[in-house]
Structures are given as structure tokens and as C-alpha cells.
Amino acid sequence: MDQSKRYVNLALSEADLIKGGRHVLCAYRMRPRPGHGYVETAAHFAAESSTGTNVEVCTTDDFTRGVDALVYEVDEAEGLMKIAYPVDLFDRNIIDGKAMIASFLTLTVGNNQGMSDVENAKMEDFYVPPEFLKLFDGPACNISHMWKVLGRPEVNGGMVVGTIIKPKLGLRPKPFADACHQFWLGGDFIKNDEPQGNQVFAPLKETMRLVADAMRRAQDETGVPKLLSANITADDPAEMIARGNFILETFGENASHVAFLVDGFVAGPTAVTTCRRNFPDTFLHYHRAGHGAITSRQSKRGYTVLVHMKMARLLGASGIHTGTMGYGKMEGAPDEKMVAYMLERQIAEGPYYRQDWGGMASCTPIISGGMSALRLPGFFDNLGHSNVIQTSGGGAFGHKDGAIAGALSLRQAHEAWLKKIDLVDYAQTHAELRGAFESFASDADRLYPGWRDRLRIAA
């Protein structure tokens, strides 16, 4: 059934839709299946995403038609389709009238992903109007909270030097806590890897008691505050709350030094919101494990990394993993700095829409995935600043002289970048950074040709 007369209005102006403030706008790359027209398929997509189905129904009235999603722009040659969704379509909480990402996802990338006339469709960007944006929680705290705990300036406080305890699974409570203590003697921040929780060989309560003690000892030995991101992800919100309360009680006077990690992609908006609303004073660390199945450049369905990041900020993530923009081991490219800017800035340009965040707090980029001291300067050059949380697993524990030296090498690489000193030159007077060149020699050969001669290290 051709629904284009009802669900397509190419006379609508995007500027007028934005000025009106009553529509969420979404841009998709869409390809119809062979034998189906582009505009007709786009119309069916909009219908399925809002008020329609595959047939006309007798219960439709004029009010219903007034909240139709409308295709307002198509470019068949580019495979581009833009749809305007009236804000009244989206579900609101009965307890406080707030908007929810679950409803946004259900409409914009729900049933339309499985339609028989759609070969593939992927959301590339979306725009939220000002009044509707106010209905989302947004972040309660961000990296400035960590800088304050660390005793740094709350503006431009610089990189938080972090790690992920490796191996990601298989450590019992004491070896895990010992590894934390070692890294904290040189670094700032430790996160649970996303699978770490309450395994039978590492019960959460026993582990957290030992880690809390390790933090106290490291702070006493260094005179510097330390930070931990503890995984509270669970299927049951009550379990998440129980874990969170136990961890805060266990860390006691250092409770403000704790962040909560939530596997936001696999556990979903409910888990993120559970943390955001029950622990508003705690940094909400959104881990995105699994997202690549949807957001990868290889995937032609679902949504992009940028869309995922924007949803995380709306949900209230304090920080989210953004990848390494091609400088680490994960898929990415330098132009993905747009993703970080969308999280950090009050006004940011996406590929299709400029988003004004209306004063909503920023969300912090968390950098991880194959990063070592040698890769940091190029990453910072591309991003243009170093106000990120950086977590290196192998980049710290893979250092030839151990975790303390690994942490110090990361800190020294950051110092060199801030001072605009060549990394090889800085390594000549900083033993831990020099050790990073020896530890990650293949990176050094690729990024710093001639480093062996300059550091007088034999091949």
C-alpha cells in the first residue's frame, strides 16, 4: 500500500521544523529492497515508526493524523531519508513526566528495522528540540567531579590516568586488589573491566573490601587521592542498587572517589537510569561493550556511534567510552572527534544536525582500547585537548617494568604533550617513558622512526 500521500511532505522546511520546536528530526541511510520505490518505502518506514500499519484502520481520526511522523527530505541517489517525529509521540513517565530513551528507540529504530520492503536503514544523526530536551535527565556530574576529588582545577584539569585491571577475568580478590594498589602508586583511576562483577571465584563483597583497603594504602603512600570505577551492572535494578550501596558503604570516607560502571548498551536504558537516579552524586561510567554489532561502520542497520553517544548524554552518563579514533586497537577514524565534541560541547555539529544542548551538563569522553604512552600524543593532537579519562590495560600492565612504571609512562606522555616536547626527547630524561618505547617497540618503530638511535637502545 502506497502511504506517501499521508506520511511524506517534501514541502516541509527543516529550518521551520527546528524553529517550531515540536519535532525530533532523524536522518537515516536507507535502501529499499529491489522492486520497491524509495519514497513509497520511506513513507511505509515513517508510518511503521509512528501511527500507521500496512493497512488503513477504521480507528484513525484527524487527531491521529496530526501526530504522524513525516518524511520531509529524501535523496535517493545518496540513500538519505529524513523524518520528523512529533514530540507528542514519545512516551513520558507517569511519576515525573520525564522523557525516556526506551521510547525514542522503540519508535525510531524499532519495527522499522525488520520491514520486508527495507533492505537496510541506519540512523546517522538526530536532533532534539529545546523543550523536549529538558525532559531528559542528562549528566549529574562529569570529569570536573573527578578533578575536584584529585585536587586539580575544575576546568581544564587534564587527563585522568587510568587502567583496566587485566586479565579481565580470572583474578581472585587479593591478586585483583594487589594489582589495583600497584597501579595506584603511579596512576589515578582504575575501572572494573565490563565482565567483572560477582564471580564465584571473586565475590564482589570480598573483592571490594580489599580494593577499598588498597585505595587507602595507596593514598597514604602517595599523598594523592585515587579513583575507582566499580561495576554495578545487573539485570535487576534492585541488585544494582544493592551493589551500589554496599560499595559506597565499604569505601566509607572515600565514597566520593568511587564511580559506578554500567554496561549501558547490553543492560539498556533502564540500567543507566537506575544508576543515574539512585546515585546522582556518583560518576556514572557508561561502558558500551557490544555496541559494535549495531554501530560498526560495517553494519548497515541500527544507528551510528554518534547517535549512541547522544543518547548516552540524554540518559545522564557522566562519561562514556568513545573509542580511540583510530589511534588504538579498536575500529575508528580521526574524524570521530565529532563524537567527543558532541558529548563535551554546548553546541555541536553532527553530520546532519547542529545540536544545542541548552545548558545540559557535558559528558566526558573515556578513551580505551590499545592505547599506550606512545599513542597518546597523536590522539591528543587530533582531539585538540587532553581533558579525558584514559584507561590503558596493556599499556600499563604491559610495561616491561610493571604497572607503576606503566602508569608513570602514561603520565609522562601527557606531560610531554602539554609542554609541546617531542616524545623521544622527553623519554631521554624520563625512565618510565623510555621503558614504554622498549615495551611497545612495534608502535615505536611505526610512530617514531629512529627512536633507537636517539635513545641509544640496541635493536
UniProtKB/Swiss-Prot annotation:
Annotated binding of Mg(2+), by residue: K191, D193, E194
Site (Transition state stabilizer): K329
Residues where N6-carboxylysine is found: K191
Matches recorded under PROSITE patterns: RUBISCO_LARGE (PS00157)
Top-level taxon of origin: Bacteria
UniProt remark on cofactor binding: Binds 1 Mg(2+) ion per subunit.
Cofactor(s) for this UniProt protein: Mg(2+)
Active site: residue positions: K166, H287
Substrates-to-products reaction catalysed: 2 (2R)-3-phosphoglycerate + 2 H(+) = D-ribulose 1,5-bisphosphate + CO2 + H2O; D-ribulose 1,5-bisphosphate + O2 = 2-phosphoglycolate + (2R)-3-phosphoglycerate + 2 H(+)
Miscellaneous notes: The basic functional RuBisCO is composed of a large chain homodimer in a 'head-to-tail' conformation. In contrast to form I RuBisCO, the form II RuBisCO are composed solely of large subunits.
Family annotation (PANTHER family): RIBULOSE BISPHOSPHATE CARBOXYLASE, RIBULOSE BISPHOSPHATE CARBOXYLASE LARGE CHAIN
Quaternary organization: Homodimer.
Listed NCBIfam families: PRK13475.1
Function of the protein: RuBisCO catalyzes two reactions: the carboxylation of D-ribulose 1,5-bisphosphate, the primary event in carbon dioxide fixation, as well as the oxidative fragmentation of the pentose substrate. Both reactions occur simultaneously and in competition at the same active site.
Protein name, entry field: Ribulose bisphosphate carboxylase
